[in-house]
């Protein structure tokens, strides 16, 4: 009969509990709907699902409707009116209000009138007002692009964090398996009388630390996954798996001038400022159109009764119609508009300064981002070399420990150094991608 001593029983229980802990998260995730997604797929989903993007798409749609409303000014205006009245008797008196006489009048009165007018000249006010609204719509489109960038960048951060945590989970799982193997080997060495129980305890403590770190990683993965699922309006049970080819892809290394040129042409803030200047130019022309008269073609018809300009009043209807040209000019614009133009020119100067400031800011931001991007490659090379050295160091220390040439503390230190190097390498690789985006 094989008798299990107390220490062996304790180790068996620990191993069983560990296996259960490792299996449980996997079984929980298995109940979820796993979905491998690339960054471009996230962006496409965000375009249709993101609440933030939908808000600014509504703003663009509203700007389109503003243009449609403004174009109504090109259409003719048609007005119709109708009224029914009760008319009293007419009173006629001398100019000094003496000798007044009352004349009976028909008491029912009616009035039907219709008038149509078409503006044929307004000094360009309608045309330039529509042009200003079209520019306003383009500004709203760049605002939409800016907020899309914000959403994309937020998604990229969550996605790369999720990728990093999953890679780190693989690193920790591998190190935990190696730690379990070391513990098994130490138990064998203890049974042979060449290792102390204290040596095993050190590695068991390290294993427990790794287990806790793994639990933290699983929690971080769930948090990032929930954020992505919520932003993209996906089912709550969706488990997003990052595209594993991302790390193997070669990141481009264009010169800074290329990035500067792209930013100069495509930066939402720069394009918004340029369009703001263009819109102010159109508004200036709208204001100047106020110095010009407005000319319209008009036509109308009027049917009314009774005929009150005859005495006695005639109980008849009379119909009149007319066609002509109307001229309207606001004389007050002569002394009011110069102040409006002065205020507008101040706004133009301010917009020029804002554009220059924005160009400078974008240029500095691109330079800083490009510098960090290049630095991330250098960091990756450094961490890659550190990982190589840490692995070589661990292999040497493990071999020496197997031959009783070093203490277990040296082996633990070497193992910790290797784990740290592996973690830093994964972080450095993800950092390159993050700085690129």
Predicted regions and their residues:
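Acidic, low-complexity, intrinsically disordered peripheral segments
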Residues: 1, 31-32, 424-437
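Bacterial N-terminal signal peptides that target proteins for export
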Residues: 6-17
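Small/polar, glycine/serine/threonine/aspartate-rich low-complexity segments that form flexible
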Residues: 31-35, 81-118, 243-253, 285, ...
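Amphipathic alpha-helical coiled-coil segments
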Residues: 55-70, 147, 151-170, 224, ...
């Amino acid at each position: 009969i094989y008798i299990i001593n107390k220490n062996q029983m304790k180790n068996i229980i620990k191993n069983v509990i560990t296996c259960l802990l490792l299996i449980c998260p996997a079984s929980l995730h298995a109940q979820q709907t796993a979905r491998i997604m690339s960054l471009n797929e996230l962006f496409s989903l965000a375009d249709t699902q993101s609440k933030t993007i939908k808000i600014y798409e509504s703003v663009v749609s509203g700007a389109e409707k503003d243009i449609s409303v403004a174009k109504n000014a090109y259409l003719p205006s048609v007005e119709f009116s109708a009224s029914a009245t009760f008319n009293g008797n007419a009173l006629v008196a001398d100019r000094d209000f003496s000798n007044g006489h009352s004349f009976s009048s028909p008491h029912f009165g009616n009035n039907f009138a219709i008038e149509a007018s078409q503006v044929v000249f307004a000094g360009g006010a309608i045309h330039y007002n529509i042009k200003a609204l079209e520019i306003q719509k383009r500004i709203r489109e760049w605002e939409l692009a800016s907020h899309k960038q914000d959403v994309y960048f937020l998604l990229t951060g969550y996605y790369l964090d999720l990728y990093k945590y999953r890679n780190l989970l693989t690193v920790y799982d591998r190190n935990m398996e190696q730690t379990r193997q070391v513990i098994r080997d130490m138990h064998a060495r203890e049974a042979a009388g060449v290792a102390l129980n204290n040596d095993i305890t050190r590695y068991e403590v390290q294993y427990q630390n790794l287990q806790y770190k793994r639990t933290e990683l699983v929690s971080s993965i769930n948090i990032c996954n929930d954020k992505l699922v919520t932003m993209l309006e996906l089912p709550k049970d969706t488990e997003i798996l990052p595209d594993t080819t991302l790390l193997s892809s070669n990141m481009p290394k264009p010169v800074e001038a290329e990035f500067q040129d792209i930013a100069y042409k495509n930066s939402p803030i720069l394009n918004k400022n340029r369009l703001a200047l263009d819109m102010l130019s159109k508004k200036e022309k709208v204001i100047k159109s106020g110095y010009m008269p407005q000319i319209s073609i008009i036509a109308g018809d009027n049917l009314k009764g009774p005929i009150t300009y005859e005495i006695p009043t005639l109980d008849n209807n009379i119909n009149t119609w007319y066609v002509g040209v109307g001229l309207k000019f606001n004389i007050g614009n002569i002394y009011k508009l110069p102040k409006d133009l002065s205020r507008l020119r101040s706004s133009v100067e301010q917009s020029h300064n804002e554009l220059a400031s924005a160009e400078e800011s974008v240029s500095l931001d691109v330079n800083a981002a490009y510098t960090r991007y290049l630095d991330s490659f250098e960091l990756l090379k450094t961490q890659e070399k550190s990982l190589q050295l840490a692995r070589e160091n661990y292999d040497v220390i493990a071999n020496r420990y197997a031959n009783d040439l070093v203490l277990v503390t040296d082996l633990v230190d070497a193992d910790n150094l290797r784990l740290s190097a592996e973690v830093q390498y994964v972080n450095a690789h993800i950092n390159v991608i993050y700085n690129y985006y």
